[in-house]
Every structure is written in C-alpha cells, then in structure tokens.
Amino acid sequence: MVNRRSFLKYLGWSGAAVTAAAPVALANTNPAPNVPATITGRVLGNGKGIANVAVTDGYSVVVTDKNGQYSLPAAAAAEFVYISLPAGYAVPHERGVAQFYQPITAKNGGFTADFKLEKLAVDDRKHQFVVWADTQIISKKDGEQLKAQSAPDLRDLVASYPKGSLFHGIGCGDLVWDHFELYADYKEAIGMTGMPFFNVIGNHDLDLDARSDDYSARTFKQQFGPTYYSFNRGQVHYVMLDDVFFIGTAKKYIGYLTENQLHWLEQDLKLVKPGTTVVVSLHIPTQTGHKRRENLKEEELGGSVSNRKQLYEMLKPFNAHIMSGHTHVNEKWEEGSVMEHVHGTVCGAWWTGPICSDGTPSGYAVYEVDGGEIRWYYKSTGKPREHQLRLYEKGRVKTASEYMAVNVWNWDPKWKLEWLEDGVVKGTPEQRVSHDPWAVELYAGPDLPKKHKFVDPTMTDHLFFFQPSASAKKITVRATDRFGGVYSETMTLA
C-alpha cells in the first residue's frame, strides 16, 4: 500500500513518477522567435491612449508614453508580449480566461501589438477575488463534478453580493491532472462563473515529454498564455509566478523560481509604490508546516520553494500576500510583511470525498478588497459562508477519547476560540497536531478511498481539543476570526 505521505513524496514532493516516463523530447517542439524583434504598439482605453502601462516580453519591462505608445526590444527567446492590466479597466476575457497577451510572430525584425481596454463604470478599489486551488481533474467524471458542483457554487456566491460587484478568479495550479484534453472542461467551468480567471501553472500542468524546464509549459502557454505576469486592480498589484521547476524526467520537479522570473519581477516591482498591497500567486507554497508535523529530517524539494528568501527580500517594501496550493491542505503563515495563504482544494481529496486530507472541506477562498486592505474567508462547496468549523463528539478522535475536538480550517493565530457549556464560557480549546477524525474514517486504511487508494489523512495544526464536564448538556464552540467575524457550532450531549 502507498499511503498519502509516500504518494506525495512519489508524486513530486521529492519528485518521482506515478506513471511511466513519457518519451523524452529531443528538440524544442514549441520554437520561439529566433531573432530579436522590436515590438511596438499602443494600449488604448475606450479608444484613447493610456499612459504608464507596463508592457513586457517576460524579460524586459517598458511603460507606455502619454499617448499609450510603447517600443519594446524583445528578447530572442520571448514568446509573448503582454501588459500589466492597469487599474480602472475591465479585464478582457474569453470563456473566463483573462486576455492580456499576444503571441509574438515577428517578421523582418518587427512586430506590432495593440491592446484595447474598456474603462470600468465602477470604482475598482473595492473588489473581490477567489482562489481555486487544485481543481485537478483526471477524468470526464471529475470535470462534470467541477461543472455541476464547484462552478455553480461560485456563481451563486457572486450572485449573493450586490449587483455590479467586481470579481476575478485565480486558478492556483494543477488545473488538470496531466490530461490536457480536460482543459476544455476547466475552461467551461470557469466560464460558468461569470468572472475572468488568471491562471497559474502547477506540476500537473507540465508537459512531461519536455527535455528541460524551458519547454515544460508549452501546452499551458497555448491554453492560458505566459506563466508569469502581473496586473492591477484598484490599489492592489497582482503577480503570478511559475515556481514548478521541471528537471527533465518523468514527474520530477522542485519548488524554485528561475533567475529570468526574478529579474523580470525586480523590474515589475520597481513600478509599484512601496507600501502597496501586492498579491503573489504561485502553485507550490513558499513554506509549509509539513516537515514539522510529519517529523521529517528535511524539507522535500518539491514541497516548498527553495529560494523563497530571495522572493521575500523583494517583497519587503510591500504589504504582501502569497497565494498557493499544491499540498491539498489549508494553512496560514506570516513572516515579516509577508502572509502566505496555502489553500485547501476545490477537488477535496482528489474528487474522492467532501473534505481534504486535513479535514478542510472542498472549496475555495474568498478575498474582499477595500483599497489596500484585504479580508478573507473560506467558502466550503455546497455550504453557507458561515460554515467555518466542525465539532466532534467526545471519543471521535481515538487518540484523545476523553476529549471533544473542533476543526477550524481557516484558523490563524489571530483567531479566538472558546467553548461553552450550557451557555457558560468554560475556556479555550487546546491546539494539537492531530488527524481530523472524519478524514481518518474516509481515507485511512489500504482499501480507502476506493477511487484513489493512495489518499491518507494528514496531520493538521487546525484541530483543537477540550474536555467537557460530565454534567454538560449542550456544548458550543465559538470562533472569532481576525476580522471580528463570529462563527459557532453547537452539539447537544446525550
């Protein structure tokens, strides 16, 4: 039996393949222009030039002049010319996929690319975005579930906000599970939500027949454009990065940001005022609690970003949030001015059950932006917004038979938890590293779950324990998030 920890290691936390190695590509099958080209054009809003818009080929960055014109000396290896969408304009999209780029088809050393935008009728300093991590569909059946459950849930969430509210989505990698024909289902799903999606490449979005990392994203690029880019909405600057570095065999990869990206990011961030809120999205987290929770001797190379310190250094002048997925668990981390949100999955436990391996419900995160301030909550698929914790009766956790337990999946250290007996506050539940008992029931053992037997429950930091009094008849756990939102769950004891 391969348990989940072993499977994740096998899958690429430290790298090896689940399936047989694909044939090695002996040549570049997606050739980029082989001569430098000068790219010129205009960025227009309602027919008028827009000044100070960043334009890039992924190597160098220029800005438009007062007439919206630019001239960009593109690198020989550049594949796209694209803009950092300016604040105040609608996001162009096709079937939900944001359109901010054009493939470079240089002729005689020159290429022209114009970008036409429409001015928003509303102030975008207030807007919302959602993070869909690891939709990870491997079959048409998974794709149908995505379209029948997840997409309508998100569409209904948008409808619950005031009419005209601005939303965009972030597809945080592993959009599919190696089966690229299912991108059509993913696109259909995001198209159903009514919002533009900006997409990040994950390890299961890689071309496994590539001979090196340079060519491992050719299918993703055909579907979604460049793998690293930025855009602006309101007072927030958004950055998407590719941190999955393919090492050229089977499914082996590490979490790593290439020098090309870091050099581009330096240029991009020079155009952003210090103190600005910057949201960086990537697939592999920059850090996790996996090593500590599982008592590992060292971090697994495919489980976090090896050169994260360099990224943190670049983000120091800003109020930075990092959005990631990959681990199929939900957790939060803060270091200096950087806060990382590692997201639970849209697919739950690879579409085998309603929760992730740490007990987090299948779902997504919702972020509400007002100026430079961001508030957030977790939205469980098929559940109301208020569903933020799950209470377990005494003995449900077999290793703590005299205790009740509560899973608060979006917890961070600024939350406040308390338990009440018959309406009287008794104390604060104790945080322990443990397994969610429902995840144990669904996924533990060699025969569970039937669909993907590699799935196992994983240790989590967001499980809390308390010992109720023998006389207690009604137990309530009350959780207050860092923004003052209060959630509770009550259980009547026999």
Annotate each predicted stretch with a short phrase.
Residues 59-73:
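Short, acidic Ser/Thr/Gly-rich low-complexity loop/linker segments typical of extracellular
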Residues 87-95, 100-107, 180-274, 295-323, ...:
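Extended active-site neighborhood of metal-dependent phosphoesterases/phosphodiesterases
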Residues 6-28:
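N-terminal export signals
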Residues 34-38, 45-46, 90-184, 471-476:
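N-terminal active-site segment of His-dependent metallophosphoesterases
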Residues 36-40, 44-59, 76-78:
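Short, ordered, surface-exposed loop/turn motifs in non-cytosolic proteins
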